[in-house]
Amino acid sequence: MPFLIELLRITGIVTLCPKYRLDRNSLLLVATKRNYIDVVRYLVKKGVDINFQETIRDNLTPLMIASRFNSHQLVELLLNNGAIINQRSLTCGNTALHLAVKNDNRITVDILLFHGANTNITNNDGFTPLHKAVIYNASIDIIKKLLRYKADVNIRDNEEENTGLTPLDIAMSCNNYEIISLLVSHVIRLDYSTCMSNKTKGFDHNKKLVKDNKRLQRIAIHCLKDIEKMKQVSINSRFTLFDLFVNNNVDLLLRCINKDNRFIVNFDKKLTVFNILYTDFIDTFMSRHVLLNKASKVLEDLFLDNDSNTSSWNNLPNEIKDHIFTYINNDELKIMTGSKT
């Protein structure tokens, strides 16, 4: 009965409100705004256009609306039924991820990233989701998650007077020290990495910002001290802890580290500025360790009946298995093992 009541309510809204047309697309938009999950599910089954953009205000799709209001169950429902995750609104060019970040909706951000949302797509102002996160003072967890999913701190917006502002430029104007510190440490990490992002003009701009600003210089000095601490920790005869951290090489760390990993896991307590990024590195490491064990068990069970076959997964050397897993990211492992996002 609640389903019928909800359907009648939104039908009444669409009928009485002159800004809506009486059709299934309008019903879907209103049902999404009201978080009427059963009604949305019903309309989706009836073949409504799931990527329809409203003709009022910001021209948002149902996915954008659900992301804006943190209706994460609806976000999952829409994505699983064909919603275009990187679709841009006609008015502002925002994507669902822009809107989720702007409203500090952590669960929705996680879901969108898991489903492949582009962290570097720009809106009409040239803002990436990372720009939005800094502008609207999003939680540090969201900013860390964006960086983990390859958000580029060196992309510049459409500001004409300064040939474009990076997220670090904006963070300095917003004066949030925690965000500034995180972005500076990320820029310095990139400088030591093999990432192509450190070959761009935006990266050169960010480096100059750090060099020319005394406050940022102090942060950079602490970063360099943290780097020296990590370089003192040998992982094997070839690599230090910093070598693995700077390129986020959790697979190599998994292969090299012994069973007692408490020293590596708790090393963040020895760091001053890099502690946030290092904690994220270790979180990825720990999560991957669990997922790889689950994935190995899934494959072992799958090939259990074929053990007599020398080409079976179970007969492969561990080195080969490890190499194969390097091509599978954590989100793909979650799908493979049926783990939650």
UniProtKB/Swiss-Prot annotation:
<dbReference type="InterPro" id="IPR018272">
    <property type="entry name" value="PRANC_domain"/>
</dbReference>
<dbReference type="Pfam" id="PF00023">
    <property type="entry name" value="Ank"/>
</dbReference>
<feature type="repeat" description="ANK 1">
    <location>
        <begin position="23"/>
        <end position="55"/>
    </location>
</feature>
<dbReference type="InterPro" id="IPR002110">
    <property type="entry name" value="Ankyrin_rpt"/>
</dbReference>
<dbReference type="Pfam" id="PF09372">
    <property type="entry name" value="PRANC"/>
</dbReference>
<feature type="repeat" description="ANK 5">
    <location>
        <begin position="163"/>
        <end position="195"/>
    </location>
</feature>
<feature type="repeat" description="ANK 2">
    <location>
        <begin position="58"/>
        <end position="87"/>
    </location>
</feature>
<feature type="repeat" description="ANK 4">
    <location>
        <begin position="125"/>
        <end position="158"/>
    </location>
</feature>
<protein>
    <recommendedName>
        <fullName>Putative ankyrin repeat protein FPV031</fullName>
    </recommendedName>
</protein>
<keyword id="KW-0040">ANK repeat</keyword>
<dbReference type="InterPro" id="IPR036770">
    <property type="entry name" value="Ankyrin_rpt-contain_sf"/>
</dbReference>
<dbReference type="Pfam" id="PF12796">
    <property type="entry name" value="Ank_2"/>
</dbReference>
<feature type="repeat" description="ANK 3">
    <location>
        <begin position="92"/>
        <end position="124"/>
    </location>
</feature>
<keyword id="KW-0677">Repeat</keyword>
